[in-house]
Design a protein with these regions (language model features):
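Primary mode marks residue(s) on the alpha4-beta5-alpha5 output face of response regulator receiver
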Residues: 28-203
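Bacterial N-terminal signal peptides that target proteins for export
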Residues: 1-11
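C-terminal segment of classical bacterial N-terminal signal peptides
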Residues: 16-25
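N-terminal acidic, proline/glycine-rich, low-complexity intrinsically disordered segments
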Residues: 2, 26-28
Length: 203
């Protein structure tokens, strides 16, 4: 499936799932965890990981204001994703053009992640890099999963509850420390309790 069709499927699925993904069901979706635990990293890998965690907030600081992200093409998809035991992923604001581009650039994440706050606002908690598997595999020079500064992406295979083709994804919890690791999919201290579907609207 071409990247444009992937983005279209993303948008269609969002219309179906928006506002209802704060249920437990999505916690059962299985990702392949390829990222190396911090304790097992080499000195070079630790240095790369630290650099990535610094680059993300430097590159996304303007998105602390969600309206800036919206003006730059990011839009809420799938409501607020959470689960009972696995924590939450929060609200994913996706840039369809960046998804279609298929370029992995630490300074230009395809997704920025927010957590709803009690006062009705949104707190920026991280970024997510995403590339469709078919788009990645279409390049004959790609002989392994995508990697960003020493961090291998996780595979979200198809079929899945989103109705999307398989994709690779890498979460970076650069704005809210994750006790389970900066690059895991779920954050135990992110909550969707304050989620309101109106978060998709401009503030």
């Amino acid at each position: 499936m071409k990247a444009g069709k992937f983005a279209m499927h993303f948008a269609i699925a969002a219309l179906v799932f928006a506002g209802v993904c704060s249920s437990n069901a999505l916690a059962q979706d299985v990702h392949s965890h390829n990222s190396m635990p911090q304790g097992e990293m080499t000195a070079q890998q630790k240095s790369q990981a630290s650099a990535l965690i610094k680059i993300v907030p430097q590159s996304t600081v303007r998105f602390q204001d969600v309206t800036v992200a919206q003006h730059e093409g990011y839009a809420l998809q799938f409501g607020c994703v959470s689960g009972d035991s696995a924590g939450a992923m929060g609200l994913h604001y996706v840039n369809g053009d960046l998804v279609k581009g298929g370029v992995i650039d630490a300074t230009r994440p395809q997704i920025v992640i927010y957590e709803p706050t009690p006062n009705g606002g949104l707190r920026l908690v991280g970024a997510d890099y995403l590339v469709p598997v078919e788009l990645w595999n279409a390049d004959p020079t790609h002989t392994s999963p995508p990697e960003l500064m020493g961090q291998l992406f996780h595979l979200f295979d198809a079929p899945n509850r989103f109705g999307l083709p398989a994709f690779y994804t890498l979460h970076v919890w650069a704005w809210k420390d994750n006790p389970n690791g900066a690059f895991v999919n779920w954050h135990p201290n992110v909550s969707c309790e304050e989620f309101n579907p109106r978060h998709s609207e401009s503030k």
